[in-house]
A protein has these predicted regions:
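Post-Walker A helix-loop "phosphate-sensing" segment adjacent to the P-loop in P-loop NTPases
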Residues: 21-38
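Hydrophobic positions on the alpha1 helix immediately C-terminal to the Walker A/P-loop
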Residues: 15
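Conserved lysine of the Walker
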Residues: 12
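Conserved nucleotide-sensing/catalytic segment adjacent to the nucleotide-binding pocket
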Residues: 39-42, 46-106
Length: 213
């Protein structure tokens, strides 16, 4: 169980996904009839729903800060990790465990949408706060076999976030996207960097169009 974290725009999602794909490609070459060995579980499904944000004391602030640590359900994530940490006695009789995904069209989580079969041997978790040294995030982190952190400078992250927010329709133009990046994403990034637990691997994110091919 490997938790890949980093500030928004660091490239952690790309890294975790590519690592799982490469492991599965190598595994398929060696054991063509075997099920995939690696799986990728993003933390997006642990966002609080829009209804939950609307029920907060300051719903406008909660909506504007969506993506901050307080807009996630870390206890729910901890329950998943705790369940996956239990000893695996019999692959054939162990039921599949499910994690939530996130539907960007409706902007809310989708329950039980990511199957994690008992045949999984490497699980990559990905999310901003997976090495955050605050309860209960750090409790979940201590259940991992390794913590990886994707490091990037804040200016590079800001440029990536502007592009991402415009392309995803989160912001109508670059100015609005820049405002969101500076007032939300990079504020969260400061908390992540300043409260990071010790990690086993630090991966420096660099621009390389050929990487991952």
């Amino acid at each position: 169980m490997i938790a890949v974290s980093g500030i928004p725009g660091s490239g952690k999602t790309s890294l975790a996904g590519i690592m799982a794909q490469r492991i599965n490609k190598l595994h398929a070459q060696q054991s063509p009839d075997a099920p995939p060995a690696a799986i990728f579980v993003p933390m997006d499904g642990y966002h609080l729903t829009r209804a939950q944000l609307a029920a907060m004391p300051d719903p406008a602030f909660a909506a504007a800060r969506r993506g901050a640590a307080f807009t996630f359900d870390p206890e729910k994530f901890l329950r998943l990790v705790t369940k996956l940490r239990e000893p695996l006695l019999d692959t054939a009789s162990t039921p599949t465990i499910y994690a939530p995904s996130f539907d960007h069209a409706v902007k809310d989580p989708v329950e039980d949408d990511i199957p994690i079969p008992a045949t999984s041997r490497v699980i990559f978790f990905e999310g901003n706060y997976l090495s955050l040294d605050k309860e209960p995030w750090n409790t979940a982190a201590r259940l991992m076999d390794e913590l990886w952190f994707v490091e990037v400078d804040f200016e590079t992250a800001r440029r990536r976030l502007i592009k991402r927010h415009v392309e995803a329709g989160i912001a109508k133009d670059a100015d609005e996207a820049d405002k969101r990046a500076r007032e939300n994403d990079l504020v969260n990034g400061r908390e992540i960097v300043e409260n990071r637990m010790p990690v086993q691997e630090i991966i420096v994110s660099r621009e390389d169009s050929a990487w991952g091919r």
